[in-house]
Amino acid sequence: MSQITPTTYEEFLALAAEGTVVPLVKTVMADLLTPVSAFLRIERQSPRAFLLESVEGGEKIARYSFLGCAPHTIVRARGSQVFIERANGNQETLQRPMLDVLRDLMREHKPVKVAGLPPFSCGAV
């Protein structure tokens, strides 16, 4: 059985009023689906798909796999230049420290905490 959280559109709207990013989660039984096989399915559809796995750090840290595709923003740095590419095609190049740029970008987003989800269920990776 699968379940989508939030369960109703009204619940989604209520959460959206609290922040700018609402995690939309679908829980499915996947006994035979590994993170790598799931990634391979997603990768076929999106050239910018990614898989991040935590394998060290105990139960609190090392139990999650993050799959993603079609990123909202891509940030790259080369030397003292930082390149920002948005999903809408806008691009900019900055001459600022990378961490300062990342802090500013993160201020644009306020993730909503949803009861029952892991501590990190959406955001920048």
Question: Where in this protein do the model-derived segments appear?
Answer:
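Signature of the chorismate-utilizing enzyme
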Residues: M1-V125
